[in-house]
A protein has these predicted regions:
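Rossmann-like AdoMet/SAM-dependent catalytic core
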Residues: 20-25, 70-200
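Short, conserved beta-strand edge motifs with alternating hydrophobic and charged residues
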Residues: 35-37, 60-62, 110
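S-adenosyl-L-methionine
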Residues: 1-43
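Generic detector of contiguous secondary-structure segments
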Residues: 36, 41-52, 102-105
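Hydrophobic/aromatic beta-strand patches that form the interior of the parallel beta-sheet core
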Residues: 3-7, 59-60, 108
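Conserved hydrophobic/aromatic beta-strand scaffold that supports enzyme active sites
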Residues: 33, 58-60, 114-116
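A short alpha/beta connector and helix-capping loop motif
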Residues: 44-82
Length: 200
């Protein structure tokens, strides 16, 4: 159906995807659209692709709704523990913004689990865009849907609501999120592997 589409189901590291796989498939540096949805190291892939000089006009990246702005979170690549689809996988909207904004991108929407960015020079085509991540997070996820990270005794939606109510106290918000992640690791049957995972 899409003769130029390339599907590669291997699990390369972000460096491989940024510097080898994309090059091997002759993806143009100024591609029109980039979609990242790997259920794990999404922001590591984004960093590698942008650092390699690729400049898509639009980017759609899956971002975990479990970590609301302004918290910054991402699972870091570790070749010894390539846990794709981990409950700790993913990247927060605020972390993605830190990565992509220096490359000249504007956030135009956050639709529950996907952040949509366009090059700054195209932002005017989308009308009056208010690119504040907190506002767009609330518009795109008004019920505070949170499918991962908060497991066991932690209800996803209520945990996100608790974090959102702590926005006025960043230290308390961060401490509560860290405590929640520790509880998720402790309650998980994958706790040995998760203890070895690195996240920011």
């Amino acid at each position: 159906k899409w003769p130029k589409a390339i599907v590669d189901l291997r699990s390369p590291s972000p460096v491989e995807i940024g510097f080898a796989l994309v090059v091997r498939h002759a993806v143009p540096k100024n591609l029109d659209f980039l979609k990242i949805d790997v259920d794990s190291y999404d922001c590591e892939y984004l960093k590698a692709i942008l650092a390699a000089g690729y400049s898509p006009k639009a980017v759609d990246i899956e971002l975990t709704p479990s970590i609301p702005p302004p918290l910054k979170y991402m699972l870091k690549w570790n070749p010894e523990y390539p846990v794709f689809g981990s409950i700790l996988g993913g990247c927060s909207l605020s972390m993605a913004m830190d990565i992509i904004q220096p490359y000249g991108y504007t956030l135009i929407q956050y639709a529950m689990e996907d952040g949509w960015f366009v090059k700054d020079e195209y932002a005017h085509l989308f009308g009056s865009v208010h690119p504040d991540p907190t506002d767009l997070y609330e518009l795109g996820n008004p019920d505070h849907y949170a499918p991962n990270i908060w497991t066991g005794n932690l209800n996803g939606s209520s945990m996100v609501e608790e974090l959102v109510h702590l926005r006025g106290n960043p230290a308390a918000m961060l401490a509560r999120a860290q405590d929640g992640i520790r509880k998720t690791i402790a309650e998980s049957h994958l706790s040995d592997d998760l203890q070895r995972m690195e996240y920011i």
